[in-house]
Design a protein with these regions (language model features):
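Copper-binding active sites and cupredoxin-like electron-transfer domains
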Residues: 1-138
């Protein structure tokens, strides 16, 4: 995920998170311990063994949750490394105040969006103000 800020930068927010979604194609079965070889046949058949956030299974859930306080403004930079699947990016319990579609930070944002599509190789930026306590789960 590469960020090129517009001239003058972005307005300040209370919390920023960078999240990348990806797929892992292994020869071994799901959750097999140890070294895993890459499986090109599964890649070509679009059958990943894992979908990961920030390169890890279960990331951003229990071990490294995205924590915010009520009333904070949040910005999430979200990208999909793919190589095959798109993402219907949604934060449980939130409506995005602003969505910068396809990562365009110079175009007017979409407003009041619940879910935004991010294609493989694409990115978006979303902003919202939290209204209830809890962890942010994508």
């Amino acid at each position: 995920l590469i960020l090129v800020e517009p001239k003058g930068g972005l307005k300040p927010v209370d919390r920023e998170f960078y999240v990348m979604q990806g797929e892992i194609y292994t020869r071994g079965p799901v959750m097999q311990q140890g070294y895993q070889e890459f499986d090109v046949e599964k890649l070509l058949a679009e059958k990943p063994e894992y979908f990961v956030l920030n390169g890890a299974v279960g990331a951003l859930t229990n071990e490294y949750p995205m924590k915010v306080k009520v009333g904070e403004t949040v910005r999430i930079f979200f990208g999909v490394g793919g190589p095959n699947y798109t993402s219907s990016m949604h934060v449980i319990g939130e409506i995005f105040d602003r969505v910068y579609d396809q990562g365009s930070l110079t175009a007017a944002p979409l407003t009041d969006v619940q879910t935004t599509l991010v294609p493989a190789g694409g990115a978006t930026m979303v902003e919202f103000k939290t209204e209830v306590p809890g962890r942010l789960i994508i």
